[in-house]
């Protein structure tokens, strides 16, 4: 892609998200979503192929439907309240429709159907943008309207997202699909605590973006898209591969890695709010997500086939293109759990 066009598209994506996050006018928020959607589609088709065309079409149809529902909710709220700005007296019907529209844009279950297919059909860089940056705009709107969201609807979608995110990733061999299902599960964790403690949602989102960005950067460094290809990188780049596996375990929420921190704090907060059954269900379903990451780690590191001795030192002569910020991302993605006591005391 031409660098000038790439810069223009990226700037439009950022601008659309910033408009959504900073506006208090419903029409401006809708326009920001539309700018973001129309700008991301050329990014999805950056590597032209039938799969990328199919992925971009699925993304467009889903986001267009969500935008239509969002506009319907805005109009209903306008008729009820008589104003275009945020109001705490939102019509219950408009609130439900808007929650469904934002869930479709985020990929929450049961509106998750497009996330794995679209992520699988695009490049790693586009997948990184789709699973991180594209979550900011709808989640920011949910954050603002959280006091008036239907609690039962949001918690139902959260539990379904955690369950489907763990269940769907069990039989996957494509790394992009695994990360897509992991994204669905993480969105479920974020929305489950949104009404009770919105600041904890922001903490979870920050750590999720950090870990996902690091994982995608490592995959781009090794040009890896399948579990088989990941296992073959062990002899060539053992340090990069071991770092990838540790960060994926962190994404699964294995203590003492940093991915355990948001799950721990969310379950603690739900318990404080007397949601014992919900916290128990989330803890049990989180094991599904951790299981397929542990299975991937086991298959990659502990089931290596016998190799010749001269292959063991191949990594010493392999000059791979390194990213300067990669070591810092790896450290932040795995070793920030000691911040937990300070966060709990501040909370």
UniProtKB/Swiss-Prot annotation:
Task: Tell me the keywords, alphabetical order.
Answer: Electron transport, Membrane, Mitochondrion, Mitochondrion inner membrane, NAD, Respiratory chain, Translocase, Transmembrane, Transmembrane helix, Transport, Ubiquinone
Is the keyword Cell wall biogenesis/degradation assigned to this protein?
no
Task: Kindly state which reaction or reactions the protein catalyses.
Answer: a ubiquinone + NADH + 5 H(+)(in) = a ubiquinol + NAD(+) + 4 H(+)(out)
Q: Where in the cell is it found?
A: Mitochondrion inner membrane
Transmembrane stretches in the record are: 13-33, 59-79, 96-116, 122-142, 144-164, 178-200, 210-232, 246-266, 276-296, 326-346
What Pfam families is this protein classified in?
NADH_dehy_S2_C (PF06444), Proton_antipo_M (PF00361)
Q: What GO biological process, any one, is recorded here?
A: mitochondrial respiratory chain complex I assembly
Q: Which residues form a coiled coil?
A: none
- Under Enzyme Commission nomenclature, its number is 7.1.1.2
Membrane topology value: Multi-pass membrane protein
Determine the domain of life of the protein's source: Eukaryota
Q: What one GO molecular function would you report for this record?
A: NADH dehydrogenase (ubiquinone) activity
Gene Ontology CC: mitochondrial inner membrane
Signal peptide (residue range): none
Described function: Core subunit of the mitochondrial membrane respiratory chain NADH dehydrogenase (Complex I) which catalyzes electron transfer from NADH through the respiratory chain, using ubiquinone as an electron acceptor. Essential for the catalytic activity and assembly of complex I.
| Family classification | Belongs to the complex I subunit 2 family.
Q: How does it assemble?
A: Core subunit of respiratory chain NADH dehydrogenase (Complex I) which is composed of 45 different subunits. Interacts with TMEM242.
User: What PANTHER family has UniProt attached to this entry?
Assistant: NADH-UBIQUINONE OXIDOREDUCTASE CHAIN 2
Protein name, please?
NADH-ubiquinone oxidoreductase chain 2
Q: Which gene encodes it?
A: MT-ND2
